[in-house]
Regions:
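Active-site residues of response regulator receiver
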Residues: 63
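Alpha4 helix (beta4-alpha4-beta5 surface) of REC/receiver domains from two-component response regulators
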Residues: 73, 80, 91-109, 113-114, ...
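Non-catalytic signal-transmission and effector/linker regions of two-component phosphorelay proteins
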Residues: 1-13, 108, 112-127
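Acidic, metal-coordinating helix/loop segments flanking the phosphotransfer/catalytic sites
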Residues: 41-59
Length: 127
């Protein structure tokens, strides 16, 4: 599966997996400002996996630490589908990731708009 992108290099459909509704809304607003057409959010792993099964995104942002769970099952599914993704964490570069994801990009919280834009447009995030 090849991710779609708009003429400006932005993905067309972004999935945000984030359990904090304020942070999720902030991501939505910022990403919408980049011209992304479809932005979906999931607050837990089960919902994210269901959304991916219904319609795979072109890119995903995964909060590492969700309430009572980690987002690694979502990362595994995205990687199997060859969909680019990045981890978002408030714990910095020291956040332990499974070896399979150690090289995946990370976006720190709080994030800068420029860093988020570059991440979404970067060819480096493709698995």
């Amino acid at each position: 599966m090849e991710p779609a992108s708009s003429f400006d290099g932005m993905p067309v459909d972004v999935l945000i997996v984030e359990d904090d509704p304020i942070i999720a809304l902030d991501f939505e607003d910022t990403i919408a400002g980049f011209g992304v057409k479809t932005i979906r959010t999931a607050a837990n792993v089960a919902r994210a996996l269901s959304m991916i099964a219904d319609r795979a995104p072109d890119f995903a942002l995964l909060d590492v630490g969700l309430v009572h769970e980690k987002s690694f099952a979502v990362a595994e599914r995205l990687q199997a589908l060859n969909i680019p993704f990045a981890f978002v964490t408030g714990y910095g570069a020291d956040t332990a990731l499974p070896a399979a994801f150690a090289a995946k990009p990370r976006l720190p919280k709080p994030y800068s708009t420029d860093a988020l834009r570059a991440l979404l447009m970067s060819g480096d995030v493709r698995p």
